[in-house]
Amino acid sequence: MHNKIDILIFGGQSNMQGETECLPAPNDPVENALEYRYLSNSFVPLVHPVGEDIEDGLLWGADKGFGSLLPDFCRAYVANTGKTVVAIHAARGATMVSEWLKGTPRYDCALKKVQGGIEAAKQLGEIDKIYYIWLQGESDAIFRTTCADYKKMLTAYKNDLKVDMGIHKFGIIEVGYFCGTVRWLQDRTKEEGRMDDEIIMTAQEQIVEEDNDFVMLTQICKELSLNAEYINPDADGHYNNKAMARIGQEAGTALAKL
């Protein structure tokens, strides 16, 4: 293994948690990458499924033990950097940005996991970069968080992660369409739903222009979320394994180029 280790922390809601249609195959371990597991304070090969259920639902592993974007993201990152990666999955579906802020139980839970992973990784080699990767916003679109409020909360969250986790950059995988596509959301038209989605998209696009701590890794979710070929047929608004592979590869390659 390379003696320089990068820590990649993955946060957000269900599409970061992973809510795909099945366990991907093939499912080979990612070379030069490990996943940190908090409950056992150990490293495991980075394969599907990722994550773990912690503290009565504050964090969840990949839904039903199926797929996520993490392995493809890390495989692309390793291929483009030649470095060793420790992946830390700290996501939970159906969460607004306000539920991740410092002072909430979820923040404390995620922080314990990340700090545990960083300390354990020091036994493997020298830690170089610590990056946070975020895929979230569908719930804020549902509840119509304003652009200004979303930016204010995400900036506060990032600032606290810089202090408490030592992150070097906050990478954003821009959220896709959700309110404008799901069948079960009956309190607005599809056009209104897309407008709600675009408020969060705009917030994420603006924040990377206004604050250099943020970096846009990919906007591909806007395209994939409107194409049934990339949607889990069993879960409206959630990406299938084919989509996760594309999102992970594109975002991981982008982060490697920083």
Question: In which residue ranges do the predicted regions lie?
Answer:
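Cell-envelope and extracellular/periplasmic
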Residues: 1-258
